[in-house]
Amino acid sequence: MDWFNTIIFELGGRPVLLIDLLSAMFGLTTVFLAGRNRKSNFYVGYMYTALLFVMFWQKNLYANLILQPISLGINILGQYRWSQPKKSQESASGDLKVSMLSWGQRTFVLALLPTLALLWGWLMSMMGTRWFVGYFPANPLPYLDCCVTVLILTAQTLSALKKWDCWIAWLLVNIANLTLYLKAGLVFMPIVSCLYLVNGIWSLFSWYKLYRHEE
């Protein structure tokens, strides 16, 4: 799959590969469709997960690679929940209604997130340094990366359950990614993150309108 590494163009003196461009396009399309309450976002999401799997495999980012089956499972759950809602959760169109977490559920999620991030960060800090040396590249920022990863999985899960709160999680992910990319001196990915951010803000208000309409 060397053709995935074809340089499409350069931006800020850095090459943008075909795999980077495709993953950005499919990722943006997925959240764009989700923000507009389209079930087709899951089909694009399957392609996006496959592209990320290939990209992480080629770049030897095995910590990210092993999370893709989890993302795939969340995507399958989301497609089922959106298409086959319980009668009490069904909208007028027959799809899953937009709902919100209760304050108790939000408190639980906020308490769980740092615990999971610390645990996953510790595991990743061991990979390549004490465990599987030579197979897993050591991560210089394991805890920071794992905080973002846990946020992404949380946002995906909430989106699969069609919770309005997912867009707050996505906005936090976008802001964190934008900061990391800018600090790394990247040009293409900050632009992509800004597009994610704009879509996240729009979707936050769009889903709130749906929630109020379907109450």
Per-segment meaning from a language model:
Residues 1-37, 82-89, 96-215:
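Polytopic alpha-helical membrane-helix bundles and their juxtamembrane interface segments
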